Amino acid sequence: MTRKIRCALIGPGNIGTDLLAKLMRSPVLEPVWMVGIDPDSDGLKRARELGLKTTAEGVDGLLPHVQADAVQIAFDATSAYVHAENSRKLNALGVLMIDLTPAAIGPYCVPPVNLMDHIGSGEMNVNMVTCGGQATIPMVRAVSRVQPVAYGEIVATVSSRSVGPGTRKNIDEFTRTTAAAVAQVGGAKDGKAIIVINPADPPLIMRDTVHCLTETAPDEARIVESVHAMIADVQRYVPGYRLVNGPVFDGNRVSIYLEVEGLGDYLPKYAGNLDIMTAAAARTAEMFAEELLAGRLALQPAAQAA
């Protein structure tokens, strides 16, 4: 049997449970622990049924088992408010943290844009921005790699049913972190992010709108080509990522309209916001796992982790 890198998941909510389904299919990652705080949570129950070890004592319930169970990568799908402490405790044991909260204490990772930049940099914490960021930043980058973008604005519309209590508590962090990453990763000089939580029933599929203001008149042909190439890159790990309309050109404004259909691993297919976040996190962790398995990466305990 091929050796796999063992992982722990923190937070058995919508995102953590959807991520677990993806990790169960991974050729290089083996989920062994699910960490929560409510012993009666559906996510912990599902994890136990799938053969994972579980604790309802939070990260402190996992720490004594990290070395015995050879956990090397942890995914935090809890809240920005507790992530820094979770990361500090696990980094101190040499565990690499993939952050699915908007805490953003580590560098941003949007796989089709900057995944390979994280190889060999020695970081012990990478941040997956937000679901809105994962869906829209590739499009901002698709424009900015053609010509300078003065301003990028994204609007992510998601179904109320797909947004759990952790995400709801982090709305301000969501908008700040996404806007910062639109600039830092997307390449816009200034960024803004808006999230709309839609209570419609039946639930609507995730929809995203991206507006970019270019500094000079848009090179329409090259932007169209760049956008389609980037969409193909995202579809490699999120097959339900689709261009609905655009790029639409109006003066220096370039507008791109997207929808994201999920695989239906945990919530139904309308919850593409879960899918794009968890698929990006799994893709990022697999890259690190491949480096670990090949002997090109060694994780060091971080004495003074963030």
From Swiss-Prot:
It catalyses: acetaldehyde + NAD(+) + CoA = acetyl-CoA + NADH + H(+). Belongs to the acetaldehyde dehydrogenase family. This is Acetaldehyde dehydrogenase 3. HAMAP family: Ac_ald_DH_ac (MF_01657). The active site is at 131 (acyl-thioester intermediate). One of its GO terms (molecular function) is NAD binding. GO terms for biological process: catabolic process. InterPro entries: Acetaldehyde_dehydrogenase, Acetylaldehyde_DH_C, NAD(P)-bd_dom_sf, Semialdehyde_DH_NAD-bd. It comes from Burkholderia lata (strain ATCC 17760 / DSM 23089 / LMG 22485 / NCIMB 9086 / R18194 / 383). It holds the Pfam family AcetDehyd-dimer. Keywords: Aromatic hydrocarbons catabolism, NAD, Oxidoreductase. Its EC number is 1.2.1.10. Coiled coil: none annotated. NAD(+) binds at residues 162-170, 273.
